[in-house]
C-alpha cells in the first residue's frame, strides 16, 4: 500500500512537471517570445513582464457586445481592465484561434486560425527568424530585438503609441524623418479601432500640446516656457511640474517625456477627445483623476472667434477684447461667436500704407494690456529683450500683439488673434495693438475719473504743507532695505544650482506687511499658537479677505534660524505639488522674518499618531493613504521637480494634514538643492532629528536620496504602530521601534506591530507588507535601501514578492539625552567620537 501511494505521488509530480514544460508561461509568466515559443489565444497564453506590472496577449474589451479579439498590453495587478496599447486595432480576430509569434521574416506577427497575417511589426529585417525575439519590459514597452547585435532594438511599441502616454515614452516631432508621434483615441470605450481624435506636440515656433479631431484643432495648451504650458489654468499646469518635460535639439526634434518612475499613472486620450491624467488608488481600488483637458467650454479651440476672449464662469462667456466689436451683432447676441470680432478703428500704420486713399496722417498706434491671458496661437519669436519687445512690434505694421515670458522671451503675433482666454490666477499679460483713438477713449475716461480725485489731493497737500511748517526739519528715516538685502542673499543661494534663465525671481514672492500678520494673528497671541518649531513659533492667522494662514515667526534667539528660513524660501518657492505645503509669501521688516503658509486645519501627523484620544481617527485606510501621499511628495522632490531636493528632516511632525487628512510635507529649512549630476553630498554640520537620521548622515555627514528614504521608513513604522521611534518598548527589553519591528519580523509576527486601535484581520497582509517595506527603507547600508519610486511601486502593487530586509541601523548616541523632536532640543553633540562632524539635534 505504501509503495503504491509513493508511486502515485511521483506520477502526479511528473505530470505537473510535464505540464509546466509544455506551457512554461502559465507556470512562470515568461516575458519574451522566441521563434519556438509563440503565444496561442486558445491556450490563454500571455507574456508577463518581470515586475508583474504589465501583461501582453489577447483580450476582449470590457462591456463589448462582440467576441472580437485584440492583441494588446494592459495593467496586470489593477482589477479594472486598463489597456495601454493595441496592435491589431483595426483588424480584430473573430475567435480565439489567434497566434502571436516570430514570423518567418523575423518580425513579430499576429495570425488568425487560417494562418492569415493580421498584423506585423513590418520591419525590414534580413535575418533568420531564430535571430530575433520579443520582450515585454517592466516599463510596458514591447521590444523586438536582434540577438546577433547585443540585443539591438529593431522595433518597440513606445515608438508606435496608441491612446496612452507612458513613463519613459516620448511624443513629438522628429526633425530628421519628419515623423510625429501622437496619441490616437479609440472609437469608443469598448471599440479599440482608430478613433477621430489625436493628440501630440505641434511643431510651432514655441511647442504646444494639441488635440485634433480629424486634423482640426479642438484644444491647445499654449506655449511651453521650460516648466509649464502657459495656456493652462494653475491646477492643470501643476501636472507638468510633476514629471513632464519638453526637450528639443538643433535638428528640429521636439519630444515630451514623463520623468516619473511610478507606473501607476495613466495619461490617455479618451474617445471623446479628452486627455486624462490619473493615478491608481490602492485603497479606493479605482483610478483617481488628477487633471483633464479640455475642462471647460472656454478650453475649446477658437471658442470666441477672432479677437474674442473667453471667460469661464461668465454668461455669456465670449467678449470682444478692448478696441474691437462683434463682426455680426445678430449672430453674436444669439450665442454664435464663431465669426469673432473686428476693429472699431483702423490702425494708423495701415492708413500710412494705403497712400492711394490719402492715408499717412494721425497719431501713432499703441497697445492695450490684457492681464492673465492664454495667449493666441501662432506666436513668432523675437530675440528682443523685455524692454525692447514693444518697440519691435510697434515698428512692424503687421504685428498685432506682443507678450513677454521670462522662460520664452519676446513673442509677436501678426494677423488675426485666435483662441484667447482670460484666467483668474494664471496666464500672462498680452498687449494688443489698437488705434490711438482707442487709447484716447480710455485716456479720457481716466481723466474724467481722476480730475476730482486730483483736486481733493491738491487741497490735502496744501493742508499737509502748512502743517509741516509747524515742525522743525527732521532727517528722513532710513529706508527699510531688509527685504531687498534678504532677496539678494536668497538669489545668491540659487546661483550655484541653476542657470540665470531658470532661476525663480524671488522678488515675485508676495511680501506681507508686519502689521497685517500681527493683526491676523491677534498680535501673535498664545491662543493662536499652533506649535513651536526648532527655529520659532507657528501661529494661526486670518487675512482680511478671510483666508486662514499659518505664520512661522523666526525666533530672535535662534542663532541658525535666519539661514534655514532663507533656505526654505529658496526651496519651497520653486515647488508645486499636492503633497507639499504651499508657501503663500513672507514678511521681512526690520528684524522680523516670517513665512506665510496655507493653513492645515488638522495640524501635523504626530498630533494624531501619538495621541491616544485621536489615534482612532486615523483608520488603516487613512494611514495607508498618508504613507502613499508622503511617498508621492518625496518622489516629486527627488525626481520629478526641475530641481533635485533632499529634505533632510523628514519626520511625523513635519507632515501636515489638510481637512481630508491628506498629507503635505513641510519644513524645508534644512533641504538641500542638488545639481542634476549630483547623487550625494556631505556636510560638516549635521542637522536633523534623532531617530530619523540615517546612519551615514549622522555618523559621517553623507546624505542622498537614500537618507530621506531612511526617514521615510521610520515614519512608515510609526504610522503602522502609532508609536514614536524614540520611545522604548518595556515588554521587549526597552527596544526602540526599529529594533522591535525587526524582532517581530524575524519571529514571523510583523502584523503584531500594528496599532491595536486600527488593526483588522482583513488588512493583515497589507500591514505585513507595509512593515516589510518600512524595514527595507531603514536598512543600515544606503545602497540596500529602495528609492522612492520603488517604494511607491511596492506599496501600490498587490501580491508582489519583496526582497528580505537586512538588519536596520541602530545608532548608539553618547553624551546627549534622547531628543524626541525639533520641538524640544537644539543642542550640539558628538556621535561616536567623530569630532569633525557637528551634529545638531532638533
From Swiss-Prot:
Transmembrane segments: 445-465
Topology, Cytoplasmic side: 466-842
Biased composition (Polar residues): 828-842
Comp. bias regions, Low complexity: 818-827
Membrane topology annotation: Single-pass type I membrane protein
EC number: 2.7.11.1
Positions glycosylated per UniProt: 63, 94, 122, 130, 196, 260, 328, 336, 354, 396
Subcellular location: Cell membrane
Residues annotated as the enzyme's active site: 649 (proton acceptor)
Binding locations of ATP: 530-538, 552
Residues where Phosphoserine is found: 558, 573, 653, 666, 726-727, 821, 830
Keywords, in A-Z order: ATP-binding, Cell membrane, Disulfide bond, EGF-like domain, Glycoprotein, Kinase, Lectin, Membrane, Nucleotide-binding, Phosphoprotein, Receptor, Serine/threonine-protein kinase, Signal, Transferase, Transmembrane, Transmembrane helix
Residue span(s) of domain Protein kinase: 524-810
Name used for this protein in its record: G-type lectin S-receptor-like serine/threonine-protein kinase At1g11330
